[in-house]
């Protein structure tokens, strides 16, 4: 991935030219991260597999997230409301509010996620590095690792707030 220079020249990221991250449960490509945008924003494209969980209920204290559904449908929990977000839907999930997402359908869902500021984009790489270091394999070990890394980044995860309709899609 080409980085912005000190003079912040425009940057175009071609299809497939982002950084692929082997994050548990997602096909993920980091298109721009905080290092390429001087910390302002990160853009991540992710595919949520059919009938799978995307992210557990969590609260960011330092970032806002924006989900734009490109293909398929995801369900988004925002505080106590659940929305079926089809292609073309934009969800603005601001800091300080609980949110989660999952794919209850039989087809993959693809989303473009913007995170501001962009420094949280490194979270995904941090999780993968910690998983490799610890050798975590089970769903419980992976979940515990994600929770630890999230906590270091001022993001709280609330596994007890998973909606009943999303529980069948949790990793086992």
Regions found by a protein language model. Name each.
Residues 27, 66, 73-75, 82, ...:
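Structural motif
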Residues 51-52, 88, 96, 106:
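Tight coil/turn sites that cap or link beta-strands
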Residues 37-39, 75, 95-121:
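Ligand-binding loop in jelly-roll beta-barrel domains
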Residues 45-49, 59-78, 114-115:
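Short, conserved beta-strand element in jelly-roll/cupin
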Residues 107-158:
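A contiguous, mid-protein "functional segment" used to position or interact
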Residues 14, 75, 80-98:
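Short acidic-glycine-tyrosine-enriched beta hairpin
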Residues 1-42, 137-172:
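A short, N-terminal "cap"/entry segment at the start of jelly-roll beta-barrel domains
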Residues 25-31, 44-60:
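Conserved short histidine dyad/triad with adjacent acidic residue
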